[in-house]
Amino acid sequence: MPRKGYIGKRDVLPDPMYNSKVLTKLINSLMYDGKKGLAQKICYDAFDVIQNKTGKEPMEVFEEAMNNVMPLLEVKARRIGGATYQVPLEVRPERRQTLGIRWILIAARKRGEKYMSERLAGELMDAANNLGAAVKKREETHKMAEANKAFAHYRY
């Protein structure tokens, strides 16, 4: 532990093309082996595909997709008296964003299209329309929280 007090979170710089911090986080999560240029190319190509297929502003589609994927509730295991309970909790805003990005990328990587840019574009368009694996993951998480509402009084 540091002796000089709390070290704050590092703030990411907004991406150069759309001036969005959330998009930078998506690009950073998409990146493998430090190849940020490649991750940016994939992301911007995906945005071009969205622009061509929907005719809408890609940033609007991305924001809509994020809103549809970010979870409000999640369950966390809590051990009480030898039994483990799944306790529903509200998700902090930062974690909501992180989970949304993570689920979109996982769902995109599992898709069948040939190129990652097409997969990402497809998943973002599906998520914007409340379809796709990422939205399904959010619904599952909410269902789990709803099913375990009886244990809400065990909150942290």
From Swiss-Prot:
Entry's Gene Ontology cellular component terms: small ribosomal subunit
Alphabetic keyword roster: Ribonucleoprotein, Ribosomal protein, RNA-binding, rRNA-binding, tRNA-binding
GO BP, one annotated term: translation
Pfam families: Ribosomal_S7
Alphabetized Gene3D superfamilies for the sequence: Ribosomal protein S7 domain (1.10.455.10)
GO MF term list: rRNA binding; structural constituent of ribosome; tRNA binding
Entry-linked NCBIfam families: rpsG_bact
Family of this protein: Belongs to the universal ribosomal protein uS7 family.
Subunit details: Part of the 30S ribosomal subunit. Contacts proteins S9 and S11.
Biological role stated in the UniProt entry: One of the primary rRNA binding proteins, it binds directly to 16S rRNA where it nucleates assembly of the head domain of the 30S subunit. Is located at the subunit interface close to the decoding center, probably blocks exit of the E-site tRNA.
The protein's name: Small ribosomal subunit protein uS7
Species, as recorded: Clostridium tetani (strain Massachusetts / E88)
Gene that produces this protein: rpsG
